[in-house]
Amino acid sequence: MLLDIYIIYFVALLPVVFLISYVYKKDLYPEDKREVFITFLLGASIILFLDILIPAVEIFNNTFFKGISNKAFMSFFRAATLEETLKLLVLYFYASKLDNFDEPMDAIVFATAASLGFAAIENVNYVFHTTETQSQAFSVALARAFSAVPLHGLNGVIMGLFFGLALFGDKDNKKYLFLALAVPIFIHGIYNFFLLINAGILIYIILFILFSRSSKIFNRIRMGQQLKGHEYWERTYTINSSEIYMNVLKITGIIIVGVIVLELIFNA
């Protein structure tokens, strides 16, 4: 029985280890492993803040929204906005302040580490707290190894890409900072929404598209590394935390307006 539990833990955490190793090795000039691991742990700690925020959010959602609009708010705000915002804050407040954070690829590595740190703790919690038997736990762990965990990892790549462009790009820095949060929230929200409306098969289309895009992103960034060498990239833009908070408010406003529209259409 104890061996079975270890096997379930192994299945739940193996995709996390595989993905973070894959991304780390893609970097031609790897980051300090200790700093990446700390970022991973900070990503895992997100669950503590969610435990505080989610009850209030769920009360709000269940009070004002029903049916399809309730599912939309659950998907795009309760899950996507809260989780992706906290990941971005880890990237901003810790990783981007490091001396070694000196090129666009670093943003991808650290964003992915934060995302997979959260994915690891979420996966273990989900596997053991939403199932009643070890057989169910194993099945859930296996299913999430090919769905939820890759989603978090690939979303980290997307977030890191735009965050890196915001810091090191030559133009449109504010736009890229907005996209560093907006795009992962949109992808994450769509993923969760498909699950809640029992259209789970569509999530694999999302994952396939994300994987294809991520491969192109890696090739593009690695080519830039090869051309520039291990030369210091000068930051072209200084990000303020107030900008991130304002972007969160903008995205939240868009989500609430969209959910209200759904409420008026389907539940009026």
PLM feature spans:
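Hydrophobic alpha-helical segments at protein termini of multi-pass membrane proteins
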Residues: 1-268
